[in-house]
A protein has these predicted regions:
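Extracytoplasmic gate region of multi-pass secondary transporters
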Residues: 35-37, 271-312
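Cytoplasmic helix-loop-helix junction between adjacent transmembrane helices
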Residues: 165-204
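C-terminal ends and interior cores of transmembrane alpha-helices
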Residues: 144-157, 344-357
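Helix-loop-helix hairpin linking two adjacent transmembrane segments in secondary transporters
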Residues: 201-247
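Juxtamembrane intracellular "pre-TM" segments in multi-pass secondary transporters
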Residues: 2-12, 249-275, 462-479, 483-488
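Helix-to-loop junctions at the C-terminal end of transmembrane segments
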Residues: 122-134, 321-334, 422
């Protein structure tokens, strides 16, 4: 009877972990995108208020006419762009625009790029921290930091405070993403369950990206700047409170085993291949988001609604792929194959961007990019947890910090190289280069088909176990240690050796 109640409690715990990680990723990525339609107009208005005088008749209560002539492409193009890149786009594409808009574009680029930069710096510290203190304390801290960031966004009226809010969000986002992925890998030991759980959690990520910009624009237009951020702050309070109430009794745990050092994981070729797949597919998205809007304006005089709708299939197809491919890749133990197919599809699709000329082509191609990226992420993320199970100590914070660093590198490097390359060789050549890189890298995923096992002795409950092809499941709820054999990637593990 006790064992049945224990299993029920463990199943309930898994569902609660999944709900909390879903909320965490949804919140972080909705805050990532909700500022996109708000910041340009708000910064322009504040700059105009600062430079206007009472006698010049400037009306600072409404958006100046010039702000309405700036399409969403400037926002999208500056999402991860460098300041010099945004300045070039401003001068070449909108020569008739007000000169102050160039300054606004630089500020927007700095603001939106600061999160990925801070997250890139913080991730190597968050990963080992979660391995040392567990996942729940960083998760709780992440919710608290996001509450602080949303509050700063709501009440900030200067560029410096907005930059501080965006940087704080990077710290909170790092805590949420690293600890969230680690929690899922820790409680979902079965391959199929883990893949399905991570696919559902990625749905929260995609929904946040889809809902963020429309929600922000509507709330900003009809309620004001503070409203969307206060709503997100309330969601953060609810998510953090739910997490605290559920997992507070679990703080009294048995001694936590020491995770594998960061440098050791970075020397693992399989983990590097998996992280590279995530990085290069992210590089595709970051580069396209930066350069496609301006290319559409130059070649087809795209309108505002066209520049906004062209990226919608990206997130929608990412949402679909993350649920479908995560289940298929784990059900048939073919994560490496789906990752290889996803990268190859992303490469071919990226090259096709340079040969397209209508909005319908771009919509279809963005749908393929979203599906390809979702396929790679939903296949590789669970795989990184398996690699730690197979080759290292099964503590997951550091390995998912590496995965998050790979995402941040893609979003930081993509826009930086996009501007100079487009200026020198053009948009079609840039797409061909990025696509070819993905096509060349895709075959490396084949090496993930049968990674070698790496036995590592660990002391648990006073007994030394040599991990070869065996999972040892640590359940913090019951403080019990279950040992079972789980075949992965078509391999049958030999019996465990007890010392």
């Amino acid at each position: 009877m006790d064992s049945i109640s224990c299993l029920k409690h463990e199943a309930h715990l898994k569902k609660m972990v999944l709900v909390i990680v879903f909320i965490a990723l949804f919140l972080d990525h909705m805050l990532l995108s909700v500022v996109v339609p708000i910041l340009p107009s708000y910064l322009y208005n504040t700059d105009q208020d600062a430079t206007s005088t009472p006698g010049n008749g400037t009306d600072s209560t409404n958006d100046p006419p010039i702000i309405h002539s700036v399409s969403n492409s400037r926002i999208l193009a500056s999402t991860f762009a460098s300041p010099s890149q945004n300045l070039d786009l401003s001068s070449s594409t909108y020569s008739e625009a007000d000169a102050d808009l160039d300054t606004v574009n630089i500020k927007v680029g700095l603001l939106l790029a600061s999160k990925s930069t801070i997250q890139l710096i913080v991730n190597p510290f968050i990963g080992p921290l979660t391995d040392r203190v567990g996942y729940h304390i960083p998760m709780c801290a992440g919710f608290c930091i996001i509450i602080l960031a949303t509050t700063l966004f709501a009440f900030s009226s200067s560029f410096i405070l907005l930059l501080l809010a965006r940087s704080v969000q990077g710290i909170g986002g790092s805590c949420l993403s690293v600890s969230g992925m680690g929690m899922l890998a820790d409680v979902y030991k079965d391959g199929t369950e883990r893949g399905r759980a991570m696919g559902i959690s990625f749905s929260g990520l995609a929904l946040g990206l889809i809902a963020g910009a429309p929600f922000g624009s509507v709330m900003y237009q009809f309620v004001g700047k503070m409203a969307p951020f206060l709503v997100l702050a309330i969601i953060a309070v609810l998510g953090g409170g739910l997490h605290f109430l559920i997992f507070q009794p679990l703080q009294a745990q048995t001694e936590r085993e020491k995770g594998t050092p960061l440098l050791t994981l970075l020397r693992d070729p399989y983990i590097l291949i998996a992280a590279g797949a995530i990085c290069f597919t992210t590089l595709v998205i970051a580069t396209i988001e930066t350069t496609l809007p301006v290319w559409m304006m130059k070649t087809m005089s795209a309108s505002k609604w066209q520049l906004g709708i062209v990226f919608l299939p990206d997130s929608l197809c990412y949402l679909i792929a993350s649920n479908i491919c995560s289940r298929l890749s784990q059900k048939y133990s073919r994560s490496w194959l789906w990752a290889c197919i996803g990268m190859a599809a992303a490469g071919i699709t990226t090259i096709s961007f340079g040969f397209s000329s209508t909005i319908y082509h771009y919509i279809v191609l963005n749908a393929f990019i979203g599906f390809s990226s979702g396929t790679v992420d939903s296949s590789v993320m669970p795989l990184m947890g398996y690699l730690v199970d197979m080759r290292h100590v099964p503590v997951y914070g550091t390995v998912y910090a590496i995965a998050d660093v790979a995402v941040c590198i893609g979003f930081c490097v993509g826009p930086v190289i996009a501007g100079p390359v487009v200026a020198s060789v053009g948009f079609p050549c840039l797409m061909s280069i990025i696509g070819t890189v993905n096509l060349i890298y895709a075959p490396l995923c084949v090496f993930l088909f049968s990674p070698s096992w790496q036995g590592e002795p660990m002391v648990r409950a006073g007994r030394k176990i040599y991990l070869q092809n065996t999972f040892v499941i640590h359940t913090t709820v019951t403080s019990a240690y279950l040992q079972r054999e789980v075949p992965l990637f078509g391999m049958t593990p030999p019996p465990v050796e007890w010392k």
